[in-house]
Each structure stands twice: as C-alpha cells, then as structure tokens.
Swiss-Prot record:
SUPFAM superfamilies: Release factor. The keyword Ribosomal protein does not apply. The gene is prfA. This is Peptide chain release factor 1. Its main location: cytoplasm. It comes from the Bacteria.
Amino acid sequence: MFDKLQAIKEKHEDLEQQLLDPHAAEDQNRFRKLNKEYRDLCSIVEAYDRYALAKKQLEESRLLLKNEKEQDMRAMVQDEISSLQESILEREKQLKLLLLPKDEVDSRNVIIEIRAGTGGEEAALFAADLVRMYQRFAEQQGWKYEVLDFNESSVPGGFREIVLGVSGHDVYGTMKYESGVHRVQRVPDTETQGRIHTSAASVAVLPEAEEVDVEIRKDDLRFDTYRSGGKGGQNVNKVETAVRITHQPSGIVVACQEERSQLQNKERAMKMLRAKLYDRQLAEQQEKRAGLRRSMVTTGDRSAKIRTYNYPQSRVTDHRIGFTSHALPQIMQGDIKDIIEALKMHDQAERLQAELV
C-alpha cells in the first residue's frame, strides 16, 4: 500500500509542475484533464502527509521516552504515544478507503428525475421542495443546474414531475445516494383539523451518457412535437417547439420543452434518453457481475423508501444507515452534505470489508 501511496505522491507533484507551466493553458482540453487528475489525487496526498507526520511524531516520542528518566515526564510521553498510535490506525484506515477503486461513472454529470408519488397535491408540493433542496445544494457545491423538463400540478408551486440536469465535479459520485423514495410527514396548509399527512416523491439520479456509451438506432425512435408550456417567449402555445422521443424497443419516453427551439429541445431530450439507456445498461451489467456486492446505500431499487422528513419533530431519518438529524429546516435549504458524507462512508466501509473477505 505504501509503495502505491508514494507513487501517487510523486504523480501529484509531477502534475502540479505541469499545471504551473505557463504554456499549460494553451491546450484547454489537456489542461482540464490534468487539473481533474490533480484534484482527484489531492485528498489522498493530504491524508498520506498527515499519516507520515503522525509516524514521524511517534518515532520522536519513542526516542524521547527511551532517554527520559523523570517518571512524570515518562507518563506524559507514554500518553502521547498511545494517542499517536490510535491516530495512525485511524489514518491508515482512511488511506485504505481513499485507495478503493472509484466507480468510473462517479465523475459524470447527472440527470435527476423527481416525481410526485402518493399524497396528491401535498406530494406535488414536496416534489417541489426536493427540487429546491437539490438546487441549493448544487449552488453550495459550485455546480451548475438547469431544468430540462417539467409537468406542473394543479396546485400552484407543485410538480407532478420535473427533470434537472446537474453538471460539475464528481456530481454522480455525490448524488447517486439520493435515488429512491423520499417520504414527508407534515400538516398541509389546507388541513383544517391539524392532522399530519404522509406523502412521498421518488428520485432517480442517472449518470449522463456520452454518445459512445450507448448505441441508439434512428429507426428505433419516434419523434413527436407539441406546443410548449416552457420559456418560449412569443412561441409558447403557438409553435410546436416541445419534443417527445419514444425509444420503441425499451418503451422509454423522454420529453423536453424548456428551450425556445425544437432543435434545442430535441438535443436535450436525446441527452435524457442516452442517460436512461445508459443507466439501464449499467444496472444489467451489475446484475450479471459475479458475486455482486449488495450495498445498503446504493441498491439501485428506486422503489425502496430511503428517507423520511418529519416536520412536526424537525427530524430527517435516512433508513438505510439509521442516520438521524434534527436540522430539517437547514436540510430543506440544501444542507445535505452531512447525510451524503455518512452514506458515502458507510458505502466505503462495505466496499473495504468486501475487499478484505
């Protein structure tokens, strides 16, 4: 493991020198690739440096203990040694987690589909709440997001369905844990008796696919156009700019109405279709893989209830790992980093255990 870590450190230093080269930015594609590779190694190198520092401090403390005669000082140094030994074990565990092979699709951008489930109008409003939560989280991460398609509900501000595109660094690796059924318990504004209602919305996070990832035959597609209800300016409800694509072999249907031109909507809809087909392809590959590790946090079962948002008790519970937070208002404003980090650590621990078996 330590030979590998030293090689990573040397690679990190080499990449840093390449990025500092005044001519590096002349080739933007190469520069972006180098910068991404450099960022991906930073966390490993920083953890390795902390580990190496603790090892050095341990050696110095042991030497000090060997030469120290005063009992009080020896006891103090022994306490320091015990503390450093615990720290080294913890940092070694962290390094093992960081060295686990990454899912190759973790760096992809994503398409997030949010659909209102059981609960009628309240479910549609909750779907809108989840949209805002993810938009605020994307802003905090420095990601970009856009609405690709939506279907508003009869209640103002609600969505029966909405599709977001999110782009940035390590988006799928972060957001993949959000797929599943999210449940809300609260008193609706229209509830006169003060009774708590339970509603739900489903979330599907799909890695964005490149054209080379999936083969789509033109003959397999059916294109329909219709009048847009989106931001089409004077074209809204006058020109058929919205596009619906049906992939006939799979039955998958995608639609986009957000852009002003039919061509732009078609391009976006094709991006959504590629993501859906790629997601299905990945799921099939996982099922066929021998000895597939069944993870609690990334089961791929989007019908599984993963989280409950209890408004009366200001509590959010993730049922996959038993994570509980009483900071519901902050979470609904996009502060979901602690939940995602807990899920990520649990997933990594499962993977590490599988590696050791």
